[in-house]
Amino acid sequence: MTRPLEQAVAAIVCTFQEYAGRCGDKYKICQSELKELLQKELPTWTPSEFRECDYNKFMSVLDTNKDCEVDFGEYVRSLASLCLYCHEYFKECPPEPPCPQ
């Protein structure tokens, strides 16, 4: 039986692979792929009023090597940052509901 963390790692890798390569390099995500990924995979955290310039800004923050694409390392660092922000946000919340065992 796979554990939740194992499932999470697999989901991170598989999600990247699902969206990467439609614009060219199969190991990178271009801006249109990133936009689709955010809208479909993180709809609760992607404001519906996001404009194209908002996606441009987001892309420029993620694209640390400035090659106009997001590689797997940049993608993982962005998810790690998201996890850190969530941890900070939720650490003061009451422990209900409990985490799945």
From Swiss-Prot:
Tissue: Skin specific, specifically expressed in cuticle of pelage follicle.
Lineage: Eukaryota, Metazoa, Chordata, Craniata, Vertebrata
GO CC entries: collagen-containing extracellular matrix; cytosol; Golgi apparatus; plasma membrane
Molecular functions per Gene Ontology: transition metal ion binding
Protein name, UniProt field: Protein S100-A3
Record keywords, A-Z: Calcium, Citrullination, Cytoplasm, Disulfide bond, Metal-binding, Repeat, Zinc
Subunit note: Homodimer and homotetramer for the citrullinated form.
Residue positions binding Ca(2+) 2: 63, 65, 67, 69, 74
The EF-hand domain, residue ranges: 12-47, 50-85
Disulfide bonds: 30-68
Function: Binds both calcium and zinc. May be involved in calcium-dependent cuticle cell differentiation, hair shaft and hair cuticular barrier formation.
Record organism: Mus musculus (Mouse)
Binding-site residues for Zn(2+), renumbered to this chain: 83, 86-87, 93
InterPro entries linked to this entry: EF-hand-dom_pair, S-100_dom, S100/CaBP7/8-like_CS, S100_Ca-bd_sub
SUPFAM superfamilies per record: EF-hand
Source taxon at top rank: Eukaryota
Modification Citrulline, positions: 51
PTM annotation: More than half of the arginine residues undergo citrullination by PAD1 and PAD2. Arg-51 is specifically citrullinated by PAD3 and promotes tetramerization.
